[in-house]
């Protein structure tokens, strides 16, 4: 009888450990912190380095009517970067071919015209069959745990909490310094 109890106890412990590993991997899979991408200079950018920071991810373009949003993005980045907030830009040429340049050309444009200092990643696709993994995460509820979304245009914003969990999708036409975004950053 003691042997049976010992075996049952061992089985229970093993099953508990297996269940815990599934729970922890499920939590990690709902976080942006699992991704590594290349920045605009080709260096590896590890989203795990953003743990403890609120994150705004935005797809950008240099020849769009919304391109002046770079100015507001940079202003809020400068104001809040030392307060556990970061913006990560992803140039994309998916809408009206409004980001035709190379990574080097995009970097020069952003620096020269808007003084961009927030992290910019290499040019990616944010929709369709070539969609990058970060945007697959951001747009699929099964991956992000919040909602399915479609990137509607350049400068759509995704807001993630300090654990890297998606909390809100913001329309491209909503300005980066909109009151609701500033309140989210500050609270």
Model-derived features: positions:
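Positively charged n-region of N-terminal signal peptides that target proteins for export
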Residues: 1-11
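Bacterial Sec-dependent signal peptides at the C-terminal "C-region" and cleavage site
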Residues: 9, 18-30
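N-terminal "domain-start" segment that seeds a small globular fold
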Residues: 25-48, 68, 133
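Amphipathic alpha-helical repeat scaffolds
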Residues: 39, 59-63
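Local sequence-structure signature of Cys/Sec-based thiol-disulfide redox active-site neighborhoods
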Residues: 51-56
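Structural microenvironment flanking redox-active thiols in thiol-disulfide oxidoreductases
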Residues: 66-131
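Thiol-/selenol-based redox modules, centered on thioredoxin-like
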Residues: 133-136, 140-187
């Amino acid at each position: 009888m003691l042997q049976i109890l010992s075996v049952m106890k061992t089985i229970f412990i093993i099953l508990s450990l297996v269940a815990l590993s599934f729970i922890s991997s499920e939590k990690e899979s709902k976080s942006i912190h699992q991704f590594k991408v290349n920045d605009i200079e080709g260096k590896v950018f590890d989203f795990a380095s953003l743990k403890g920071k609120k994150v705004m991810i935005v797809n950008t373009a240099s020849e769009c009517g919304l391109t002046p949003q770079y100015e507001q993005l940079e202003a809020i980045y400068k104001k809040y970067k030392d307060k556990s907030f970061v913006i990560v830009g992803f140039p994309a040429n998916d809408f009206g071919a409004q980001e035709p340049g190379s990574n080097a050309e995009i970097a020069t444009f952003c620096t020269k015209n808007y003084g961009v200092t927030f992290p910019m990643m290499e040019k990616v696709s944010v929709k369709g069959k070539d969609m990058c993994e970060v945007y697959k995460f951001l747009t699929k509820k099964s991956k992000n745990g919040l909602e399915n979304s479609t990137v509607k245009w350049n400068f759509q914003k995704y807001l993630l909490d300090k654990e890297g969990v998606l909390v809100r999708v913001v329309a491209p036409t909503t300005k980066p310094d909109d009151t609701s975004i500033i309140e989210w950053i500050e609270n």
